[in-house]
């Protein structure tokens, strides 16, 4: 089972940023996950409905928290069924209840900061910088 402490959360998020690029801006109203169908993938919209044609995993957008959790070993199919239901704290608690991971409380605050900025339309690199500043300042905006 994956345990996410703050160092692990930062590593996984930074891997996501490296993959997409620090200037990547998440298309908030776009499809968020892909579901495996043999070796192909289909977009899945925020409400969980399949959309569009099959695409490769490289083409399938996902939020920064979802990408990080996937990189940590949370199954894509589980993310598909659950991640659109809420924000970072909701997803972490749901995954913990499902037995997929455990996490430290400071992870919730840091990932929430990352997600807030991502959802406000800033780049993933800027979202991580914001979360790091919030952590340094004791999370005054959370």
Where are the regions a protein language model picked out?
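Catalytic phosphate/metal-binding cores of nucleic-acid and nucleotide-processing enzymes, i.e., regions
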Residues: 2-5, 19-26, 39, 45-49, ...
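Residue-level detector of alpha-helical secondary structure
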Residues: 10, 14-17, 132
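Predominantly extracellular beta-rich ligand-binding scaffolds that present long acidic/polar faces
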Residues: 30, 35
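Short, P/G- and charge-enriched loop/turn segments at secondary-structure junctions
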Residues: 52-54
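Active-site nucleophilic cysteine motif
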Residues: 56-71
